[in-house]
Each structure stands twice: as C-alpha cells, then as structure tokens.
Amino acid sequence: MNGLKQAIIICMLLFLTGCVQTEVYDSSHISEAEVVEALQNYNIDLTEGTFVEEEIFVSKLNGVKPGEYELNEKLIVIYEFDTSEEREKGEKEFATKTASMNLVSYETFIKRNIMIFYVHEEHLNSNKIIPFVKEIQEALDSFIEG
C-alpha cells in the first residue's frame, strides 16, 4: 500500500509540474555581421556607407552607433544592442527624439537585440509594394528562437 501511495504522489507531482506555465527568455545575441549575412542569404546586397542627409536614423541610440548601409540607393541601418532590454531603451529614445519630426517613410524591424531602419522613402498611401520589406523580415525570421 505504501508503494501505491508513493506512486500516486509521484504521478500527481509530475502532472502538476507539467501544468505549470514557464516563460522562455531568448538570451541569444545576434551580431550585425550575422544580420548582414542573413540579408545576403535573401538576396539583399548591402553596401557600407556613410549617410549625412538622414542623420536622425544614424544617430546614437542608447549609446549604440549603427552600421550604415545602402540598399538599392536607400538607407538601411542596423543597430546591434547588447540585450533586448537595451534595444527597447533605444526604441524609446528614437520615439522621443522623433516625436515632433516629420520623417521620410521608413520601416522598423526588430529581432532580439537588433533594430533595423529601412528608409525607403516610398509614399505610404499608395498601393505599391515597398521593395525588400518582405525579404528583410524573412531574413530576421530565419534566426531561430531558443
């Protein structure tokens, strides 16, 4: 009888621990070089450059200076923060800096510690598909969570 009680208790404990929800935090760091390589795998060829005319997009955010690239004559910048939390602070800083500005059209892409601005300057009211947006997102989605 003692063995049966122990078996029931063990089964109950296993059942209860299986029902407990746990949050998974992805702590793996993505480097700028890994992002550039992933983009190249999706046929996005970047050229390094320095861009003054779109200064707000290449400014330091939360102490991080981004990598500046050209994609089909448009600016794309890649911020590599140390952590996702640092990236969130950078996002908030950008929102604060640009709150009262009238910016050109751009897309923001986020993945873990990475933030990308693609300054495509397309009219957002048109039905035109913005080039490279899908490919950039797919390249970032190729980084497996966990």
Task: List PLM regions with ranges.
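Bacterial signal peptide processing site
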Residues: 20-23
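Secretory pathway targeting signatures of secreted, lumenal, and periplasmic proteins
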Residues: 53-74
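C-terminal motif of bacterial Sec signal peptides marking the signal peptidase cleavage site
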Residues: 15-18
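Sec-dependent signal peptide recognition
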Residues: 2-10
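A short acidic-to-branched-hydrophobic micro-motif
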Residues: 68-88
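A short, solvent-exposed beta-edge/loop patch
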Residues: 98-146
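Short, Gly/Ser/Thr-enriched beta-strand-loop segments that form substrate-interacting elements
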Residues: 84-101
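Post-signal peptide N-terminal segment of mature Sec-exported envelope proteins
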Residues: 26-49
